[in-house]
UniProtKB/Swiss-Prot annotation:
Disulfide bonds: 32-48, 36-50, 41-55
Superkingdom of this protein's organism: Eukaryota
Species lineage: Eukaryota, Viridiplantae, Streptophyta, Embryophyta, Tracheophyta
Annotated keywords: Disulfide bond, Knottin, Plant defense, Signal
Protein role: Probably participates in a plant defense mechanism.
Modification after translation, per record: Contains 3 disulfide bonds. This is a cyclic peptide.
Family designation: Belongs to the cyclotide family. Bracelet subfamily.
Record remark on domains: The presence of a 'disulfide through disulfide knot' structurally defines this protein as a knottin.
Protein name, entry field: Cliotide T12
Cross-link annotation Cyclopeptide (Gly-Asp), location: 29-58
An individual GO BP term: defense response
Propeptide: 59-123
Species annotation: Clitoria ternatea
Length: 123
C-alpha cells in the first residue's frame, strides 16, 4: 500500500529531473525558441532579444558582437545608452570576457517616492 503512495511522488521527481537537464543543455548559444520576423520576442522577460529574425539570449548577442552597432541595446557606458535612446543605465554581464553591456531604463526608488510625496491628497 505504501508503494502506491510513493509512486506518484517518484514520477514527479523523475519528470522534474528530466526537465531540469533539458533546460540546462539548451541555455548556451541555442536560440530562445521562436522567430521574430513579424512580432517581437515573446520570451523577452527571460532575457531574449531579436537578432537576425531569431530570438537569442541577451548574453549570447553581447558575446558575439563585433561592435556596439550590432544591436541597439549594446553599450559600454551609460552615455552610450542615453545617446542611443535605449535607456539610461548600462549593465555589464557577469562574464568577464563579454566587453559590451546591455542598456535598460532604470529609475531610482527615491525619485519615484519623491514624486509620490508631492501628490496632493484630496480632502
Amino acid at each position: 500500500m505504501a508503494s502506491l503512495r510513493i509512486a506518484p511522488l517518484a514520477l514527479f521527481f523523475f519528470l522534474a529531473a528530466s526537465v531540469m537537464f533539458t533546460v540546462e543543455k539548451t541555455e548556451a548559444g541555442i536560440p530562445c525558441g521562436e522567430s521574430c520576423v513579424f512580432i517581437p520576442c515573446i520570451t523577452g522577460a527571460i532575457g531574449c532579444s531579436c537578432k537576425s529574425k531569431v530570438c537569442y539570449r541577451d548574453h549570447v548577442i553581447a558575446a558575439e558582437a563585433k561592435t556596439m552597432d550590432d544591436h541597439h541595446l549594446l553599450c559600454q557606458s551609460h552615455e552610450d545608452c542615453i545617446t542611443k535612446g535605449t535607456g539610461n543605465f548600462c549593465a555589464s554581464f557577469p562574464e568577464q570576457d563579454i566587453k559590451y553591456g546591455w542598456c535598460f531604463r532604470a529609475e531610482s526608488e527615491g525619485f519615484m517616492l519623491k514624486d509620490h510625496l508631492k501628490m496632493s491628497v484630496p480632502n
